């Protein structure tokens, strides 16, 4: 099971899921990452093992 958390290292709009994924994995130790729209903003979310 994966738990979603907003990225702590990403700033600004998330327009590149691949970049978000790489940053979550390499900088935050996440399983993977992806861009999602929340409250009208494109944000990078990281997914961690719960």
UniProtKB/Swiss-Prot annotation:
One of its GO terms (cellular component) is extracellular region. The keyword Disulfide bond applies. Disulfide bonds join 3-50, 14-35, 20-44, 24-46. InterPro entries: Scorpion_toxin-like, Scorpion_toxin-like_sf. It is found in: Secreted. Possesses antimicrobial activity sensitive to inorganic cations. Has no inhibitory effect on insect gut alpha-amylase. Induces potential changes in fungal membranes and increased K+ efflux and Ca(2+) uptake. Interacts with sphingolipids and ergosterols found in fungal plasma membranes. Belongs to the DEFL family. This is Defensin-like protein 1.
């Amino acid at each position: 099971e994966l738990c979603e958390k907003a990225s702590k290292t990403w700033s600004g709009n998330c327009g590149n899921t691949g970049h978000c994924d790489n940053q979550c994995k390499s900088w935050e130790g996440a399983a993977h990452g992806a861009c999602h729209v929340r409250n009208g903003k494109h944000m990078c979310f990281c997914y961690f093992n719960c």
